[in-house]
Amino acid sequence: MKPLSLLAALVASVMSCASLAAEPIVIKFSHVVANDTPKGKAADYFKKRAEALTRGKVRVEVYPNSTLYKDKEEMEALQIGAVQMLAPSLAKFGPLGVKEFEVFDLPFIFDGYDDLHKVTQGPIGRGLLDKLSARGITGLAYWDNGFKSFSANRPLTSPADLRGLKMRIQSSKVLDAEMRALGALPQVMAFSEVYQALQTGVVDGTENPISNLYTQKMHEVQKHLTLTEHGYLGYALITNKKFWDGLPADVRGQLELAVKEATTYANFIAKQENDDALDKVRKSGKTAIYAPGPAERLAFKKALLKVHEKMDDRVGMDLVQSIYKETGFDPAKL
């Protein structure tokens, strides 16, 4: 090869390598809810901060509302590397084989956000995230959504009112036991299918934080909503472990900061978003809203406490007891 030709080839090679080096790292972030939910807003905030902090080295593509993968598909997509990040509900990890996460599904185990954050922001929560590593997943943080309430097409003022109702749940042995303890018939169903199922009568009711109920327009096909706040629905922000470990150290550090900022934002707005959604449901006039008094809420607690005992072996008695100790919950005082 002539010297000039060799020089030209070397220059072209260097330019090609530089071009490849300049290509941003793409993070596909799939989720199943609307953009204007706590998770949807947090995902968009993470995108904004990740791209800013890495100065364009990372591009985050957010796919909301099951536009890329449905509820039951996204975990496998993450494990095979088809997407890089998810924020699935905590109930999703039980079917994955990490049954301890179903402790978050236990009814009334948390009496509000203060109790919850003692767990999710402490060593118990970190220890649970670390259990995902064996599944090829790195757990990054917990994102709040809110506390769930029951909805149906008939009034639900006592535990007995749920008897015989077909209630949609996520795939969770704990949630299955919860509904059966109330005499309801649990129906596992993907989140994206719930509105149509309620509309057509395939299921009679569901349990959701109010932001999910409102943004998915479920209030349009549910005549009654009872503010039981009986259970928590939150998310774990997770990533493919091989992808995360393979990132350049500086980029990973910048993304860790973006995760921290997005988590603070997510958990700050969660309660506000649910309060705003409740106000919008009320103003819509489509759904009658019932707020149980202390005695009525206690009746729901007593009816559902047996689920804790039944699920001890599944989620781990030591784990349940450690949460009781952390939050000060004492079932004997009910």
Cite the ranges covered by each PLM segment.
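Bacterial N-terminal signal peptides that target proteins for export
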Residues: 1-7
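N-terminal signal peptide c-region/cleavage motif recognized by signal peptidases
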Residues: 16-19
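N-terminal secretory/targeting leader peptides
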Residues: 22-115, 123-334
